[in-house]
């Protein structure tokens, strides 16, 4: 199928989706949020995850690593088991599925074997929309995650929409330039409950809004989007365009990026 025709077909599918759980006889979109560690998808895009699940789409939270290095003083196998349980609990709250890709926290490798593995995974999943880390980030695992996903997107001839999420902007994500803001007010409590499921990471109401910056980011992006709380996303150039608000039935159209 020529690229222009395929691109238009994707846009038509996205524009016509707007599904709810009650319209299960209509096609659903496959949406993947791919984070480097357990808690990345939930804190960076938990609102999108919750809204997409509530709209009836097939939504999966994908973890590149299992967070083995994320609990100081705890051996890697035990830490991984704890963080897997926390991620599964968080995703149950959001109503999404989980996939763990098995890379090692703090030692993620980018090589031809991993490129092939990610490309094969995405080819098998056949997603319509993928959200992953912004490429300019102080955390090496975040950068590796972006690299692997972006390479797979190119290898798959840019078949799916590719968007980026921010992680603790200014501390981890650097120079984030959003193209879309998504009103998450309707699912804010659910997003927070999912984030707080990551007990081992010390995510509490106080730290969520304080040292981890997530609450501050939600309010700031809300100001930009002319609502109270929002998440921001950046579309990769040459990616199919998704109107996230229309797709997820969250109300007015997103405010375009500056």
Question: What do these predicted ranges mean?
Answer:
Residues 1-3:
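N-terminal secretory signal peptides that target proteins for export/translocation
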Residues 6-9, 19-34, 109-258:
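Metal-dependent de-N-acetylase/amidase catalytic core
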Residues 12:
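Metal-dependent phosphohydrolase cores
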Residues 20-125, 154-155, 246-255:
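Active-site rim/loop-helix segments in enzyme catalytic domains that contact anionic ligands
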């Amino acid at each position: 199928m020529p690229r222009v025709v395929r691109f238009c077909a994707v846009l038509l599918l996205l524009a016509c989706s707007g599904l709810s759980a009650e319209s299960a006889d209509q096609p659903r979109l496959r949406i993947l949020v791919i984070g480097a560690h357990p808690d990345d998808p939930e804190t960076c895009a938990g609102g999108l995850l919750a809204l997409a699940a509530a709209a009836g789409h097939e939504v999966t939270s994908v973890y590149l690593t299992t967070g083995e290095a994320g609990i100081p003083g705890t051996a890697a196998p035990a830490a991984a088991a704890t963080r897997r349980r926390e991620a599964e609990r968080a995703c149950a709250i959001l109503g999404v599925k989980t996939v763990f890709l098995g890379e090692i926290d703090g030692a993620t490798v980018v090589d031809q074997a991993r490129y092939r593995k990610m490309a094969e995974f995405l080819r098998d999943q056949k997603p319509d929309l993928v959200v992953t880390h912004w490429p300019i980030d102080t955390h090496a695992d975040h950068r590796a995650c972006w690299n692997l996903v972006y390479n797979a997107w190119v290898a798959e001839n840019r078949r799916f929409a590719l968007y980026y999420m921010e992680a603790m902007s200014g501390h981890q994500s650097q120079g984030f330039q959003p193209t879309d803001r998504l009103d998450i007010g309707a699912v804010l409590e659910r997003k927070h409950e999912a984030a707080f499921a990551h007990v081992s990471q010390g995510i509490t109401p106080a730290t969520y809004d304080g040292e981890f910056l997530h609450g501050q980011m939600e309010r700031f992006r809300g100001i930009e989007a002319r609502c109270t709380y929002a998440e921001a996303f950046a579309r990769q150039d040459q990616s199919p365009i998704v109107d996230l608000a229309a797709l997820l039935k969250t109300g007015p159209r997103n405010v375009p990026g500056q």
